Amino acid sequence: DIRKKYIKFLGYEFKMVRGKSRRGYISRTIPDRDRLKRKVDQIAEEIKNIPKCYSREQLIGEINRINSKVRGIIQYNQCCTWVSVAMDKHGRRLQLLAMRRLKQYKGKWIPANQTQNLPHIHQQYKQKIPSVKYRDIYVGFTALTFCRWEQTRYKNQAETPYTEDGRQAYFQRTKKKRINARLDEMYPDKTARA
């Protein structure tokens, strides 16, 4: 009974809880807590294993690699309604680990909107993140708490590759060029005709 106990499916936990809907229940989704903890532990180990003798360029590369893993976890789980609640439990731990590792490199707590990496994400937040100075810019570890719930779209049954209307609907939703248009641009005219 999903009104009493969570069910696990594809890395998410799903439950129906009492709410203000017409039928009395609303759905609550949360990232699978065990799986999320394993992923965060893996990232924490990678932060701990950053060598103390790295050059600045190597350190920046390592920060970017770890940031991409954090963003991947966030993007996979942002369709959950309780994503921010789940991420808050682990976010502070990663930030403190990162700051402890950056002390050897004279790291500081800098507001996220003043760092230069991941600008489309960090510009929305004023929370301080552990950062290191490289030349005259700051590069920081992104926070696991920089996530928001995004409602997923329902499947549009008319969107099919077999009809012109379906292809047009897909193009409008994704704003992508069609495959044959891409191939025409990739090859020169002589090759395309042959």
Placement of each model-derived feature along the sequence:
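Non-catalytic terminal/accessory segments
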Residues: D1-A194
